[in-house]
């Protein structure tokens, strides 16, 4: 079962710090014409292991989501695909592809900003971590800087619609 994690003030502040970094990466992605999603992977000492943003359009690669790119980079950096000691911060609830990669990497903790009512597969549309197909019990914190994460995405999509 996906495990909810309780927060103390210090933990909350640390999570906000890293989510702000993910938001900054998402902003750069949005300015480049990508859906503004950013991801940061940190170790237990608070060191950035990997970070990325969406690059589907730039790379013409449907798998170039922020989470997948960050997981790939972290695995290469550590020379190990087991990421159980790491935390992934991402601005938007992961899709099914990204959730699968998160589960397969045995990630220690997932922290995301805002639910995705269209394709979120942590809890919103589907709960992949709790499905019988999941062989890893994922710890999850959601709603960190939810409002700025939601507003960033909404503003980007409103701008895109006006440009059409």
Spell out what each predicted region is.
Residues 58-68:
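A short, polar/charged loop-to-alpha-helix boundary motif
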Residues 1-32, 94-164:
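Zinc-dependent deaminase
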């Amino acid at each position: 079962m996906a495990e909810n994690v309780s927060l103390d003030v210090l933990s909350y502040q640390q999570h906000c710090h890293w989510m702000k970094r993910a938001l900054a990466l998402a902003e750069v992605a949005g300015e480049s014409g990508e859906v503004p999603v950013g991801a940061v992977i940190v170790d237990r000492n608070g060191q950035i292991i990997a970070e990325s943003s969406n690059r589907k359009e730039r790379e013409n690669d449907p798998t170039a989501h922020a989470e997948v790119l960050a997981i790939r980079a972290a695995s290469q950096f550590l020379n190990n695909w087991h990421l159980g000691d790491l935390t992934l911060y991402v601005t938007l609830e992961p899709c099914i592809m990204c959730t699968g990669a998160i589960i397969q990497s045995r990630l220690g903790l997932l922290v995301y900003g805002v639910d995705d009512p269209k394709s979120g597969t942590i809890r919103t549309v589907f709960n992949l971590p709790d499905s019988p197909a999941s062989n890893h019990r994922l710890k999850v914190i959601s709603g960190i800087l939810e409002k700025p994460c939601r507003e960033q995405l909404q503003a980007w999509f409103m701008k895109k619609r006006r440009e059409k």
